[in-house]
Amino acid sequence: MSEKHPGPLVVTGKLSDGERMKSQSNFLRGTIAEDLNDGLTGGFNGDNFLLIRFHGMYQQDDRDIRAERAEQKLEPRHAMMLRCRLPGGIITPQQWLGIDKFAADNTLYGSIRITNRQTFQFHGILKGNVKPAHQLLNQLGLDALATANDVNRNVLCTSNPVESVLHQEAYEWAKKISEHLLPRTRAYAEIWLDAEKVATTDEEPILGATYLPRKFKTTVVIPPQNDVDLHANDLNFVAVADKGKLVGFNVLVGGGLSIAHGDKNTYPRKASEFGYIPLQHTLAIAEAVVTTQRDWGNRTDRKNAKTKYTLERVGVEVFKAEVEKRAGVSFGAIKPYQFTGRGDRIGWVKGIDKKWHLTLFIENGRLLDYPGRSLKTGVAEIAKIHQGDFRLTANQNLIVAGVPEKDKARIEALAREHGLMDDSVSPQRENSMACVSFPTCPLAMAEAERFLPEFVTRIEGILQQHGLPDEHIVMRVTGCPNGCGRALLAEMGLVGKAVGRYNLHLGGNREGTRIPRMYRENITEDEILAITDQLVGRWAKERHTDEGFGDFVIRVGVIAPVIDSARDFYDVQEAV
């Protein structure tokens, strides 16, 4: 341990109740199977409420009608959100048609939600439809295993359709990493797929009998795009190419954005550079990072249990040395890499494989049929004729990938007919993102997805007023401090504090390599817009050529940059 990080390798003390729950779960089985047959409640009881998360589900209820149901002496309208495991975000048109039909027939909302972790979610699955949902995924060659709770979650991979060979190689590694780090328990197959129970003891050689201390997120990144927001993730493999071929990875560890309001022991953190590895060591390094965090992560306090806190407690060099020891691999010096942006290239691009790729902007990732814009039907119609694949992006958009020249006009016609292509969408709207929040998320403190569209319209008005209609601010809204909307890597981030109120963070950058600092606490939409109007006015007049909004507010002293978030994230800055 270093002088800067005198903390112990293992935190001792009373374990959190989550650890009890996992240890008593019989490798994630609990009594979920019995609970499925309990018709007296629409929800899962006791430990099962949390255990189902390991199976890719969250128990939710419609918060818009919660009080009304309570007055009627009814339990909340319980329904499950189910999240698919889809490493790298690639799904076939045939698979898509299967999930499209299920969403229409078996969910309360009828929508498909593309997430910023490159997968899709069903919202509003009633308890009786949960098992059929898992069985449908299995029939389609998919599953929901380990997309939530204390495991390695869905592995992201940069959506880069132009560099087709490099993307394919990176995507294959994302799949391998995902498979390697999956739970080995047979609980998922037994409960949902009616697999035969085998009279052997489960083993979890990588994750351990009580799994990880907290959720764990992994990415494969292809510079110069940082669409996956690597600094929001525990483990990152940054692709290093030679003549267009993947040869190895720079490894970065310990990023994460989740905080808790009022708890200064929680903070966002950028990932630390560990070094370079050739391809053949990828799985060994992934496993070593995960097992080190498994053994050293804080199991007494879930708010302090993520990899970022372990690194701060023991020190980056100590953690890195342990990873090298466990993997039997020494990191080389970091290879040069640079990020230039993280937005998706909306519209058509041609790959080096001569195929065309169409990126469709899906506001908030929500596919539903709206009056005059039948988005969900449109994607299904494209799926019926498309010969390539679909790619879900970390910006919640959808790429129709691998389109031959002869099909291009037909697919564009369908996209335009159903409102999936709209030339009037502004750069600001394309670079704004929100988490789901109300009405389904139980953690929501303020609106996010439902708030964003009209809020963006008002931001567009401010940009227009100051002569910047084609400019944009990377803007994120998250309904609570858990950070699903990745607001703490935005140029302007809104973090929900209470209904109608947000903490406003400024000073991130377009590349996603700087954490924004809180500028105002607990303010209303109108207050945020007044501040934005003032600052955009200055930006329009005083900015340097091609200077982004986040870089500008730091350069002119509106706010100080976050340099070392574990120590300076909460420093109070006098606003200019």
Swiss-Prot record:
Protein family (similarity comment): Belongs to the nitrite and sulfite reductase 4Fe-4S domain family.
Pathway(s) per entry: Sulfur metabolism; hydrogen sulfide biosynthesis; hydrogen sulfide from sulfite (NADPH route): step 1/1
Pfam families registered for this protein in UniProt: NIR_SIR, NIR_SIR_ferr
EC numbers on record: 1.8.1.2
Function field: Component of the sulfite reductase complex that catalyzes the 6-electron reduction of sulfite to sulfide. This is one of several activities required for the biosynthesis of L-cysteine from sulfate.
Cofactor (UniProt): siroheme; [4Fe-4S] cluster
Gene3D superfamilies: Sulfite Reductase Hemoprotein, domain 1
GO cellular component: sulfite reductase complex (NADPH)
Binding, siroheme: C484
PROSITE patterns: NIR_SIR
Catalytic EC class: oxidoreductase
GO molecular function per UniProt: 4 iron, 4 sulfur cluster binding; heme binding; metal ion binding; NADP binding; sulfite reductase (ferredoxin) activity; sulfite reductase (NADPH) activity
Assembly behavior: Alpha(8)-beta(8). The alpha component is a flavoprotein, the beta component is a hemoprotein.
Entry's cofactor comment: Binds 1 siroheme per subunit.
Record key words, sorted: 4Fe-4S, Amino-acid biosynthesis, Cysteine biosynthesis, Heme, Iron, Iron-sulfur, Metal-binding, NADP, Oxidoreductase
Reaction(s) the record says it catalyses: hydrogen sulfide + 3 NADP(+) + 3 H2O = sulfite + 3 NADPH + 4 H(+)
Protein name (database record): Sulfite reductase [NADPH] hemoprotein beta-component
GO terms classed as biological process: cysteine biosynthetic process; hydrogen sulfide biosynthetic process; sulfate assimilation
Sections of the chain in a coiled coil: none
Annotated residues for binding of [4Fe-4S] cluster: C435, C441, C480, C484
SUPFAM superfamilies, per database record: Nitrite and sulphite reductase 4Fe-4S domain-like, Nitrite/Sulfite reductase N-terminal domain-like
